[in-house]
């Protein structure tokens, strides 16, 4: 264990401070599989941890600008070790006395930060996908008079969501048996946020088809572009028709702690439920998500279970038996990450981190707007920004192909790591600026590298 901690310490120092350190060492999938098969047969176990460090993606590298995976605070290594060793499942109080108490403290602080009044509450669960599913199950339980949980659907049901929302909302609706027709996707406007002017039209159209709408979801922000929906307008619409208003703040819900950017979440304080991932913008390891309710009774009533060997029948508020509220019967002591970060650093650490990364998104936009051979998809509202190399002499098809090839070349090169996305048929390079060590100089270097590679890929017919 001492050797591993020394190895990790050296890895972190080198990753952050050495400019030549790669973000990843690319291997083809079959080659990677072949390596680990052979290692299992003949490899020395002493080499296992060094190989893992060498053959994984380094999120602490300042040139990591890829997926929405948080750069973990080193102190969470210790909370993770403790959780893994003690292995308290938490479903019932006696299998998680401290973590159940700690989880309540954490969720109460989060509810207060959102702006929920008493009797708000919530719990931690394993990821935004599961949290969004659970929230929509709560919505159905609260807003549909028929007992769907025990008796099945009595009529077609539906939820409203922007077409740019994370795919997990679509997946949750299908898991719930709503079907394709039960997912009412409202178009996005030119800024890739829900077009609130079309809410009424899509609602009435669904009602005319016999679909009972029971919930509407606001993205804070959407995954592809990092754009925040107008939560205040959605809340007013939800109130008009007595719909459950859920905020998917998996990525950007942490902006509740940012004095500069908390306005992006205006309206969330009146939502019925909200999701915030700790492993995105709160510097925690995967996977930990808070699901918060404006009225905590909805958390208690979502699931009807018959598990006498676990829980005794009682009408009391058994907050200490978390298995009553979560989809999981067993979960990790993920609350330790939240509690320790809040205890050691306070809420100000999230204010500093979120504000710094969102500011960097704006700075990157300014940098791109000065470059004639780059264009952005939309002005960033967070630390997510979509852009592409462009050339007026090239067709849309050519540009899509060039940008895709540039991205693959960067992946194989390993110095930088970024991803790609398609928006209305146009392929963009997509950066999520998660790393607090990433600077303007790193981003300038990235653009220079993209430009150099892109120019080499311009078809000869265009060069001539």
Where are these regions (language model features)?
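PLP-dependent enzyme catalytic core of the Aspartate aminotransferase-like
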Residues: 422-464
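Conserved PLP-enzyme active-site core in the AAT-like
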Residues: 131-300
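Short loop-beta-helix segment that forms the pyridoxal 5′-phosphate
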Residues: 110-137, 184-187
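A non-catalytic, amphipathic alpha-helix used as a structural packing/dimerization or gating element
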Residues: 3-7, 101-105, 109, 352-363, ...
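N-terminal entrance/gating region of PLP-dependent enzymes' catalytic architecture
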Residues: 2-119, 411-412, 416, 434, ...
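Active-site C-terminal subdomain of aminotransferase-like
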Residues: 222, 266-371
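Short, glycine-/Ser/Thr-/acidic-enriched flexible segments
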Residues: 70, 164-166, 190-191, 221-223, ...
């Amino acid at each position: 264990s001492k050797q591993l901690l020394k190895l990790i310490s050296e890895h972190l120092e080198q990753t952050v401070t050495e400019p030549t350190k790669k973000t990843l060492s690319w291997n083809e999938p079959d080659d990677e599989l072949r390596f680990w098969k052979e290692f299992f047969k003949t490899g020395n176990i002493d080499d296992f941890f060094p190989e893992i460090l060498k053959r994984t993606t380094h999120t602490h590298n300042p040139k990591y600008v890829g997926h929405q995976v948080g750069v973990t605070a080193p102190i969470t290594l210790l909370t993770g070790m403790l959780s893994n060793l003690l292995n308290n499942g938490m479903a019932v109080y006696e299998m998680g006395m401290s973590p159940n108490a700690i989880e309540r403290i954490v969720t109460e602080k989060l509810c207060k930060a959102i702006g929920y009044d008493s009797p708000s509450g919530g719990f931690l669960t394993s990821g935004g996908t599961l949290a969004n599913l659970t929230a929509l199950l709560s919505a159905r339980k609260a807003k549909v008079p028929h007992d769907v949980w025990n008796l099945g659907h009595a009529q077609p049901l539906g939820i409203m969501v922007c077409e740019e929302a994370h795919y997990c909302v679509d997946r949750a609706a299908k898991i719930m048996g709503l079907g394709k027709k039960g997912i009412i996707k409202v178009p996005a406007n030119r800024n890739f946020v829900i077009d609130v002017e079309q809410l009424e039209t899509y609602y009435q159209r669904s009602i005319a088809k016999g679909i009972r709408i029971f919930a509407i979801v606001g993205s804070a922000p959407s995954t592809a572009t990092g754009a925040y929906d107008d939560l205040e307008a959605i809340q007013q619409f939800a109130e008009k028709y007595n719909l459950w208003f859920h905020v998917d703040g998996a990525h950007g819900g942490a902006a509740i702690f940012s004095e500069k950017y908390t306005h992006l979440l205006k309206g969330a304080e009146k939502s019925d439920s909200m999701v915030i991932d700790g492993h995105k913008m709160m510097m925690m390891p995967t996977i930990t998500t808070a699901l918060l309710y404006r009225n905590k009774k909805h958390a208690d009533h979502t699931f009807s279970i018959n598990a006498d060997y676990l829980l005794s029948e009682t009408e009391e508020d058994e907050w200490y038996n978390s298995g009553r509220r979560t989809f999981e019967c067993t979960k990790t002591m993920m609350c330790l990450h939240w509690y320790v970060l809040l205890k050691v650093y306070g809420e100000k650490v999230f204010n500093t981190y979120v504000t710094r990364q969102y500011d960097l998104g704006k700075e990157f936009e300014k940098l791109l707007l000065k470059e004639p051979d780059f264009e952005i998809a939309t002005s960033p509202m967070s630390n997510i920004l979509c852009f592409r190399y462009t050339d007026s002499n090239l067709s849309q098809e050519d540009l899509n192909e060039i940008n895709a090839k540039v991205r693959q070349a960067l992946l194989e090169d390993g110095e930088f790591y970024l991803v790609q996305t398609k928006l209305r048929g146009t392929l963009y390079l997509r950066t999520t600026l998660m790393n607090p060590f990433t600077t303007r100089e790193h981003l300038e270097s990235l653009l220079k590298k993209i430009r150099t590679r892109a120019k080499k890929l311009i078809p000869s017919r265009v060069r001539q």
